[in-house]
UniProtKB/Swiss-Prot annotation:
Cofactor note text: Binds 2 manganese ions.
Group of enzyme by EC: isomerase
Function: Isomerase that catalyzes the conversion of deoxy-ribose 1-phosphate (dRib-1-P) and ribose 1-phosphate (Rib-1-P) to deoxy-ribose 5-phosphate (dRib-5-P) and ribose 5-phosphate (Rib-5-P), respectively.
Keyword Manganese: yes
Enzyme Commission no: 5.4.2.7
Catalytic activity: 2-deoxy-alpha-D-ribose 1-phosphate = 2-deoxy-D-ribose 5-phosphate; alpha-D-ribose 1-phosphate = D-ribose 5-phosphate
HAMAP family, alphabetized: Phosphopentomut
Protein known as: Phosphopentomutase
Swiss-Prot/TrEMBL GO biological process terms: 2-deoxyribose 1-phosphate catabolic process; 5-phosphoribose 1-diphosphate biosynthetic process; metabolic compound salvage; nucleotide metabolic process
């Protein structure tokens, strides 16, 4: 069958489409990120997602089912344990996470780790608890500026996050401290999935805002992924957003950092004008970071509408031998209690101008369907010990 020369995989970070059968085991009852967002607003204008068939896949208030949807679409279950960024993305590319990444949500980090971090960086530490970024800055941002102490905090994810003011603490110093933290947290008892630099600006409480100079220091994937298979066989693997950070650069041939999700789509549109063969892998993080965690369904809805405008431009630029895949890495229902991710199905929406058929496909048991399909398209074998079955033959 016909193979695609370029595949664009866009991850709308946290856009879940309803709780998985095991969601209650994760404390997530009746969650539905996309559905509840639509119910929270008076209108929801996403014509391009609508014509692809998103409302055919999942009922959405204000959005009609398409009579003739353009795309193939289905729900994907998460096979791995967890509901975090790394687990979702790693599974997409073939890895099955059977042991959850260690979290320090309830306990904070061990004093021994904090003492070593202070000793190595020269900065005292405040915080050491689970918190949202906005709350921790309101509480400790002024103190950090006045003292030079580091704000260290975590979340429901396997992360150690360090906040520093861009002007008084300095970006280079923040990155240096995070590199030390990453080295220390490779130790088994302190191991976290990611260390995240969280720079911010502002003069006082209520004015602090995190900047786009965030940097993630992730663990290397424990095995080879579809990205490695592509790169090792001479194909392009162009990342946009935090994809390269999530995989610690493994299997990436070109990395493009984004200032926002809108910027990420603008970068994707520019990449579409280039001649390459392989994968453009995009993560759009604002949905999760700005709206999901902050439990702001109205802001989330507006972000989806902005995405839909740029999606229209993507659809116009797609060539006959291009394939677009739209998906998500987990849920983050902004109407749910708390501030954490939610365990949900995610969408798989696939479209090419050359497709002759369309419609609903059967739910699959793993996000790894994506990586397997991409590898199959380029006639590559997936690395050993990966999961996922290709649906390429159905994308006609």
């Amino acid at each position: 069958m016909k193979k695609y020369n370029r595949i664009f995989t866009i991850v709308i970070d946290s856009l879940g489409i309803g709780g998985m059968p095991d969601s209650m085991e994760y404390g997530d009852k009746n969650v539905d990120t996309l559905g509840h967002i639509a119910e929270s607003v008076e209108k929801f204008n996403i014509p391009n997602l609508e014509k692809l068939g998103i409302a055919n896949l999942h009922p959405i208030k204000h959005v009609k089912e398409a009579n003739k949807p353009l795309a193939h679409y289905m729900k994907m279950k998460e096979a791995s344990v967890g509901k975090d960024t790394m687990t979702g993305h790693w599974e997409m590319m073939g890895l099955h996470i059977t042991k959850p990444f260690q979290t320090f949500t309830d306990t904070g980090f061990p004093q021994e780790l904090l003492d070593e971090l202070t000793k190595r960086t020269g900065h005292n530490i405040v915080g050491n608890k689970s918190s949202s970024g906005t709350e921790i800055l309101d509480e400790l941002g002024e103190h950090q500026m006045e003292t030079g102490d580091m704000i260290v905090y975590t979340s429901a994810d396997s992360v150690l996050q360090i906040c520093g003011h861009e002007e008084t603490f300095g970006l280079d110093e923040l990155y240096r401290c995070c590199e030390i933290a990453r080295e220390l947290t490779l130790k088994d008892e302190w191991k976290v999935g990611r260390v995240i630099a969280r720079p911010y600006l502002g003069a006082k409480k209520g004015e602090f805002k995190r900047t786009s100079n965030r940097h993630d220091y992730a663990l290397k994937p424990y095995g080879s992924t579809a990205l490695n298979a592509l790169k090792d066989n001479g194909f392009d693997v162009i990342s946009v957003g935090k994809i390269s950070d999530i995989f610690d650069g493994e299997g990436i041939t070109e990395s493009n950092k984004s200032k926002s999700s809108v910027h990420g789509m603008e970068q994707t549109l520019e990449i579409m004008d280039r001649d390459f063969k392989g994968l453009c892998f995009v993560n759009l993080v604002d949905f999760d970071a700005l709206w999901g965690h902050r439990r702001n369904p109205v802001g989330y809805a507006e972000e989806i509408e902005k995405f839909d405008v740029n999606l229209g431009k993507v659809l116009e630029k797609l060539k006959e031998d291009d394939l677009l895949i739209i998906t998500a890495d987990h849920g983050n229902d902004p109407t749910y209690v708390g501030s954490d991710h939610t365990r949900e199905f995610v969408p798989f929406i696939a479209y090419s101008p050359s497709m002759k058929e369309n419609g609903l496909m059967d739910t699959v048991d793993s996000f790894a369907t994506i990586g397997a399909t991409i590898a199959d398209n380029f006639e590559l074998s997936m690395p050993e010990n990966t999961i996922g079955k290709s649906v390429l033959e159905k994308l006609v």
